[in-house]
């Protein structure tokens, strides 16, 4: 989608954003990672590139969590001001420049789970706006906790609780009987 829009792309993934470490309370490791990652993006930002996170968790870390953890770090501040969630970025392009022709309808309904890490960015339901760009899209929205919570849903001590928390969201998805299930 970005290439079709004429966006010049450079892929740069130095390492994990550290969300799993943050969820485990390891602020020291998150800080170390944040400093390394932010510094690695400075030259791209200085060349005029925006930084686009492909997951809402990573966008949340770069835009909000890292600046709270290391508020005096200039590289982190610069990155936070130039980082975007992928949905947010494409929706902004569509509003400001329009999208190239060629978007085709999908066969069947779409169930969209608005992830907590997406909602925490206070940017609105950009993933819903993005999906609405698909002609004739039939979208049902799930605004309930999935219970996953990063590592919370997969760790043995909390797995059953996570399943219990996520059941209402799963039921809502099943009820809409979609062809596609996506999460922001």
Tell what function each PLM region has.
Residues 1-184:
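Iron-sulfur cluster-binding electron-transfer modules in prokaryotic oxidoreductases
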